[in-house]
Structures are given as C-alpha cells and as structure tokens.
Amino acid sequence: MTDQEYMLRAIQLAKKGEGWTNPNPMVGAVIVKDGRIIGEGYHKKCGELHAERNAIASLTESAEGATIYVTLEPCCHYGKTPPCTEAIIEQKIKKVVIGSRDPNPKVAGKGAQILRESGITVVQDFMREECDRLNPVFFHYITTKTPYVVMKYAMTLDGKIATKTGASKWITGEPA
C-alpha cells in the first residue's frame, strides 16, 4: 500500500465517528510497520479514547519504529482523555503523518512540536484537503465560536413557495 492509501484508510475510519464525536472532530489513525497495518482506530464518541489511542489499543505487535497516519494533529493536553502525543512517544513510533492541523488553541501546532522535540519525524499537511473535509463544523466552531449553519431554501422565480391557491408544487429536487 502507498502513503495515500494508508491516509485514505484513516479517513475511512474517521467517518465511522460521524454523528457521535461532537463537539470533538472526527479522527482516524492507522499504524503501519514494515508495509503492514498493525493497528487502526478512530474517535468513536466524545469523552472516549481518541483515534490514536484506539489504534494503539488494537496493535497486533510492537509499534516501535512504526509510522502512524492520523487525519488530525494529535492532541497534547489533558481533557477527558490524556494526550495522544504521550501515547505515541511511549510506543516509540518513529514517524507521524498528519493530515489536518488542529486549530484548537490547546493544540495548534503544539502537538507536532512535542513529537518533533521527542525525536519523531513529523510530516504535516499530507492530503490536507481530504482530511479537512472531515471536520468543517469543528473547524468553524473552534475558530469562530459560532455555530456552523447550513440552510437550503427553495422558491419559484416569483419568490413564492406555493401557488396562489396555497397548493404546494415541487420546486426543488435532487439536482438542487
């Protein structure tokens, strides 16, 4: 498998958390050693272990010298769970490939910096566009502190939503 395929697998795993992780982001992680996936995980639910720790918990062998592909920069602070950076360092993982940068002020580059200071090779912005697409709601909220709102409004050319008699007509559909 290629680096892109490992990150695509991490993205696929992250999507399993859709609808469950709020207010946290969806994150997936894949641990690779000698060209084989030896662990994988995703953030399943707010308050539970993050993707990196779930991937570590699923290890089939030692992660020493392995590479972890993660869709979002690993956290480096204590919250409902301990920092993922600590777990990565403890496992002696040699390389971390990060998709999206975490805009949360508690992380925002600090996670990558801690890993580098521990002698770990860090690659950032790998398939960033694809990884960023996982969490537009999280990114918007964490940077603006306002809700992410999507609205769809359909009307006829004269600005109406029904006929003069009040009867509804289909004015939108799948193509919209």
Question: Could you say what each language-model-derived stretch is?
Answer:
Residues 27-35, 153-154:
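Short beta-strand scaffold segments in enzyme catalytic cores
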Residues 44-57, 171-175:
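A short, polar/charged loop-to-alpha-helix boundary motif
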Residues 1, 23-30:
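Polybasic, low-complexity association/targeting segments
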Residues 53-78:
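Mobile, glycine- and charge-enriched loop segments
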Residues 1-21, 37, 78-176:
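Zinc-dependent deaminase
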